[in-house]
């Protein structure tokens, strides 16, 4: 049993800095300003479920999917970096106020007409939480841990779903507490957080691209 707890602890130490639920909370605050409490809670739960599903698929089928479509981890990093940087630029340099933008109006109408429409999958679950770095780490870990001898076989079988569940629960708790943060910071604070998050996302996206390019150079040099 101690081996299981040790494996879960190691997994959380590796994944939490990459997933960074607090970053997702700040992004959520910038995107959910027009949502009521019930809708924010629903988005929080759905984002957590999506994160769990993405991590499970990445661990058990990620390498197969990437091999099937000929996708390399450097390619995954560069594509994810472009997406993150694009989202960051849109948040950092909004052409108009967020609540007056066509995207916001379209999303509001979509949420009214179609309850299943949401921001939980993109960008909260992917790429903010289960982004290219997280997915790449999970896929690379899956290809090595199954051949490792540090833990018993049953621990290697049981630990990954529990680690992903723990990350999802932490994300859900963080997003649920964002309501209190919204009451404290107000609309102006949300705008400031949104712009700050935009800058951070641009930096993250550029770094993902740099890492991908460096891996390509290292591979083919």
Swiss-Prot record:
The keyword Chloroplast does not apply. It holds the Pfam family MarC. GO terms for cellular component: plasma membrane. InterPro entries: Multi_antbiot-R_MarC. It is found in: Cell inner membrane. It is a multi-pass membrane protein. This is UPF0056 inner membrane protein MarC. Keywords: Cell inner membrane, Cell membrane, Membrane, Transmembrane, Transmembrane helix. Its main location: membrane. The lineage of its organism: Bacteria, Pseudomonadati, Pseudomonadota, Gammaproteobacteria, Enterobacterales. Belongs to the UPF0056 (MarC) family. It comes from Citrobacter koseri (strain ATCC BAA-895 / CDC 4225-83 / SGSC4696). The keyword Transport does not apply. Residues 29-44, 90-118, 172-196 are cytoplasmic. Residues 1-7, 66-68, 140-150, 218-221 are periplasmic. PANTHER family: UPF0056 INNER MEMBRANE PROTEIN MARC, UPF0056 MEMBRANE PROTEIN YHCE. The chain crosses the membrane at residues 8-28, 45-65, 69-89, 119-139, 151-171, 197-217.
